[in-house]
From Swiss-Prot:
InterPro entries: Amidase, Amidase_CS, Amidase_dom, AS_sf, GatA. This is Glutamyl-tRNA(Gln) amidotransferase subunit A. It comes from the Bacteria. Its EC number is 6.3.5.7. PROSITE patterns: AMIDASES. The keyword Nucleotide-binding applies. Transmembrane segments: none annotated. It comes from Dehalococcoides mccartyi (strain ATCC BAA-2100 / JCM 16839 / KCTC 5957 / BAV1). GO terms for biological process: translation. Belongs to the amidase family. GatA subfamily. The active site is at residues 79, 154, 178. Keywords: ATP-binding, Ligase, Nucleotide-binding, Protein biosynthesis. Signal peptide: none annotated.
Length: 486
């Protein structure tokens, strides 16, 4: 008997199409798994079984009539930063505890049109600020590989639920690593598309020039199938790029012979664990065995500045974006007060957690008159230098290969009181957002029973190339097939 929760999208699709299983069965199997594991994993903010079962029923009806697309009837989860009409969307913040959006995010509509089934909304660091889900105002998600460890963040719930086989796939958002870092920590495939490839309409904004939505899946093929469904122009997002969506799954043939891959040395910094470097070296050996050429002498000298640039630009944008939470328009409101200003202050003081407040203060400072040129403008200039450096490298290479993270999943509480240590988790992922590039993290082995991720970075809008390399690697390895014992 097939273990329904272990199936990929592609495998489930085949069984659904051949009428060997129904979406209702598949959905029920996942809902049961959620019920069994959630007390331990805590990946979900909200589970919506009624919605899931009625969507599964609709999918089964469509399939009976021969109307089946790659995601029809497939149970999925969405990070709680994506607006879902009629379903609470909290961003794991007290500020939006009871916020029920009156509309769907663009990607949510797209997935609904495909017939995907929504199991629920996943836990995250508050407003996507963090690398461990410990900044959730509600609870910390556990890493399915070792429940004393964090699952990464900010999309920790979305990564954990796929790793724990509670959902076939999920969506997250990535501003500085929030998809790739938890994908690495949980040993799943996590994809950040090129900036502009997926509409941000209905994604609660953190840092708009960096945010992108992307999938968590069990392998690169599934990732391509989800990208096919969510990518594409949308005039409601002014940064959405008007170009035809490629077929992300075409070219996934396992062949990367002749591909030129560069390995930038700055990504193997002082804070990198040597046993992670070893795993990455093994992975490079696999890629070279597949016929790709590997150049380890690549240098991107501005890399060390990326973290500083990010922690000026992202908080600046956040301070502007989060000004909307004033207790008047929507969300939490504290109002037993004397006047409007006091109400606003108290709303924000009580509604936001410490990390969100820290970022708002950093951003407000960086944007304030007198400091704007010294911090914000300077960071923008360095951002351009970082982008140019990548563009130069891509004249020689088809893709760049790095570790996804400098560290292994760490213990719950370990970095919570040291924000800088937490920020350092993203040294390998942040430069990619700064330059708007596509990048994927794929499972590359284990150290002390904990997952290591490999990052493949592509040229702007060469998303298919990154996926092709990821797929080829997965044809030659089995790391992505390993699942935690739960
Ligand atoms: N949002 C992200 O992509 C994660 C990053 N760790 C941050 O805290 O900003």
């Amino acid at each position: 008997m097939t273990d329904l929760v272990k199936l990929t999208i592609a495998q489930s699709h085949k069984l659904l199409k051949d009428h060997k299983i129904s979406s209702a069965e598949l959905t029920k199997a996942h809902l049961e798994r959620i019920e069994k594991l959630e007390p331990e994993i805590k990946a979900f903010m909200t589970v919506c079984p009624e919605t899931a079962l009625s969507q599964a029923e609709a999918a089964d009806k469509a399939i009976k009539q021969g109307d089946i697309r790659p995601l029809t009837g497939i149970p999925m989860a969405l990070k709680d930063v994506l607006c879902t009409k009629g379903i609470r969307t909290t961003c794991s913040s007290k500020m939006l505890e009871n916020f029920v959006p009156p509309y769907n995010a663009h990607v949510v509509d797209k997935l609904a049109k495909e017939g995907a089934v929504l199991l629920g909304k996943t836990n995250m660091d508050e407003f996507a600020m963090g690398s461990s889900t410990e900044n959730s105002a509600y609870f910390t998600t556990r890493n399915p590989w070792n429940t004393d460890k964090v699952p990464g963040g900010s999309s920790g719930g979305s990564a954990a639920c796929v790793a724990a086989s509670e959902a076939v796939f999920s969506l997250g958002s990535d501003t500085g690593g929030s998809i790739r870092q938890p994908a690495s920590f949980c040993s799943v495939t996590g994809y950040k598309p090129s900036y502009g490839m997926v509409s941000r309409y209905g994604l609660v904004a953190f840092a708009s020039s960096l945010d992108q939505i992307g999938p968590f899946t069990k392998d690169a093929m599934d990732c391509a199938l989800v990208m096919n469904a969510i990518a594409g122009f949308d005039d409601r997002d002014s940064t959405s790029v008007p170009q035809t969506v490629p077929d992300f799954s075409s070219g996934l043939d396992g062949n990367i012979k002749g591909f030129k891959l560069g390995v930038p040395k700055e990504y193997f910094s002082q804070n990198m664990r040597p046993d992670i470097t070893e795993k990455i070296n093994d992975a490079l050996g696999v890629l070279s065995g597949l016929g790709a050429s590997i150049d380890r002498e690549v240098s991107l000298p501005h890399t060390p500045y990326a973290l500083a640039v990010y922690y000026i630009l992202a908080p600046s944008e956040a301070s502007a974006n989060l000004s909307r939470y004033d207790g008047v328009k929507y969300g939490y409101s504290y109002n037993p007060t004397e006047n409007m200003w006091e109400a606003m202050e108290k709303t924000r003081a009580k509604g936001f957690g410490p990390e969100v407040k820290r970022r708002i203060m950093i951003g407000t400072y960086a944007l304030s008159a007198g400091y704007y040129d010294a911090w914000y403008v300077k960071a923008q200039k360095v951002r351009t230098l970082i982008s140019q450096e990548f563009n130069n490298a891509f004249e020689k290479y088809d893709a760049l290969i790095t570790p996804t993270t400098p560290n292994l999943p760490f213990s719950i509480g370990e970095k919570l009181n040291d924000p800088f240590e937490m920020y350092m988790c993203d040294t390998c992922t942040i430069p990619i957002n700064i330059a708007g590039l596509p990048a994927v993290s794929i499972p590359a082995g284990f150290v002390d029973g904990l997952p290591v991720g490999l990052q493949i970075i592509g040229k702007p809008f060469a998303d298919q190339t990154t996926m092709r390399i990821a797929h080829a690697f997965q044809c030659a390895t089995a790391w992505h097939k390993e699942t935690p014992r739960l």
